[in-house]
Amino acid sequence: DCAAGAALIAQRCPDLRSRFIIQIYHPEEYDQVADLGFEHIILTVYQMSWSEKQDTAALVRFAAEHPLEGITFPVELADTPGYVEALLEAQVPLFVHTVNDPADQAALVRQGISGIYTDLGAPAPQE
């Protein structure tokens, strides 16, 4: 549970809260985490229902009402026409998971994606 993990961090390391970026899985977790003193929060749609993930208007509205470090979503949604463009209206960084192919990563960055979760380390140097 996200809030329980955040509570444990807040209890054991209260002076380090500003160094953590807490990833919440549902909008209703935001206030619980923020009330513990965490200022850096990412909303990931990973555990939301498919219809909630696709409701870009609700996600943009949520981001307008709650300071976020970003919104994270599966790469499949980036392929949905208009999805990335709609979320860019939130004016927060967008992150996708999981993309390992460098060409796919570059294409996502061109779409406006700010960061990419990957299973790989740093890209190999180009010769």
Give names to the regions the model predicted.
Residues 1-127:
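Short loop-to-alpha-helix "cap/lid" segments that border enzyme active sites
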